[in-house]
Amino acid sequence: MKVWWAVLAAAILAGCRAQTEQEVEVPEQARWKAGQPWELALGRFWDYLRWVQSLSDQVQEELLSSQVTQELTMLMEETMKEVKAYKSELEEQLSPMAQEHRARLSKELQVAGALEADMEDVCNRLAQYRGEAQAMLGQSTEELARAFSSHLRKLRKRLLRDAEDLQKRMAVYGAGAREGAERGVSAVRERLGSRLERGRLRVATVGTLAGRPLRERAQAWGERLRGHLEEVGSRARDRLNEVREQVEEVRVKVEEQAPQMRLQAEAFQARLKSWFEPLVEDMQRQWAGLVEKLQAAMPSKAPAAAPIENQ
């Protein structure tokens, strides 16, 4: 029984080790890598979310903490800050235009509220998943992982839909603004371009500083976990070899002692036979003597009974 437990433990450790040695891939969303500052900030939020999902279960369990929720909240606030800054700059630079253009801009940017709600939903879902994982300890980790992946897929679809909608609306309005600028607002376009460039640089700097420590920590966790699993696997293999050697020694001893045990059993059987055979013979002799006495006594009693019947 101990041998089977040791084999099962070694198989589980080997599976965990194979899972942790897979390369962590961080998918890239090309469509958010260039464009407005809010698009770059949204790309950072998107990449971080996909990166957390791509990690192994062990590293995910460590990363799904309040710190990750805070990092996502920071990226979400950075994205909405850039969207609001872009809206304020457009309103400031387009103030000479008609009032209906500014009203149209405010109406078009209302979709940014839906985008913010979706990003907040992502953070809330991560916190909910962490609580469910703690409450469902002892159940299958595969079921938790499937539920987590399903939540993220749905949230990514909503996030992508609202982001694309906002991008299309901003592109349409930006095209109108460029046409107006070409008709005489070239100064506005120059100032807006310089501010957008500064926003791109700021978002790129924030993204680099935010992403580098997380990747370094994840790599360090992966290395520590891999080393620990290798050490445990080595100890399990050594213990398994020791158990196999002990079982082999017991088997050899049993094979060596089997003939001796058979001889001892035969000798004990002969001894029992020698004990009981005299008793059986004595009982047979006594029984035969008793039968003879009974047979001898029966004829002597029969004539004595006849005179009694005649009277």
Curated annotation (Swiss-Prot):
Signal peptide: 1-18
GO cellular component, one term: chylomicron
Superkingdom of the source species: Eukaryota
Primary localisation category: secreted
Record's comment on post-translational modification: APOE exists as multiple glycosylated and sialylated glycoforms within cells and in plasma. The extent of glycosylation and sialylation are tissue and context specific. Glycated in plasma VLDL.
Sequence repeats: 74-95, 96-116, 117-138, 139-160, 161-182, 183-204, 205-226, 227-248
Record carries keyword Phosphoprotein: yes
Xref: Gene3D superfamilies: Apolipoprotein
Stretches for region Lipid-binding and lipoprotein association: 203-283
Start and end residues of each stretch annotated as LDL and other lipoprotein receptors binding: 151-161
Protein residues bound to heparin: L155, R156, K157, R158, G222, E223, R224, L225, R226, G227, H228, L229
InterPro entries: ApoA_E, Apolipoprotein_A1/A4/E
Localization per Swiss-Prot or TrEMBL: Secreted; Secreted, Extracellular space; Secreted, Extracellular space, Extracellular matrix; Extracellular vesicle
Molecular functions per Gene Ontology: amyloid-beta binding; cholesterol transfer activity; heparan sulfate proteoglycan binding; heparin binding; identical protein binding; low-density lipoprotein particle receptor binding; peptide binding; phosphatidylcholine-sterol O-acyltransferase activator activity
Residue segments, region Specificity for association with VLDL: 271-283
Phosphoserine modification, residue list: S140
Function field: APOE is an apolipoprotein, a protein associating with lipid particles, that mainly functions in lipoprotein-mediated lipid transport between organs via the plasma and interstitial fluids. APOE is a core component of plasma lipoproteins and is involved in their production, conversion and clearance. Apolipoproteins are amphipathic molecules that interact both with lipids of the lipoprotein particle core and the aqueous environment of the plasma.
Assembly description: Homotetramer. May interact with ABCA1; functionally associated with ABCA1 in the biogenesis of HDLs. May interact with APP/A4 amyloid-beta peptide; the interaction is extremely stable in vitro but its physiological significance is unclear. May interact with MAPT. May interact with MAP2. In the cerebrospinal fluid, interacts with secreted SORL1. Interacts with PMEL; this allows the loading of PMEL luminal fragment on ILVs to induce fibril nucleation.
Protein's name according to its UniProt entry: Apolipoprotein E
Organism this protein belongs to: Oryctolagus cuniculus
Gene name of the record: APOE
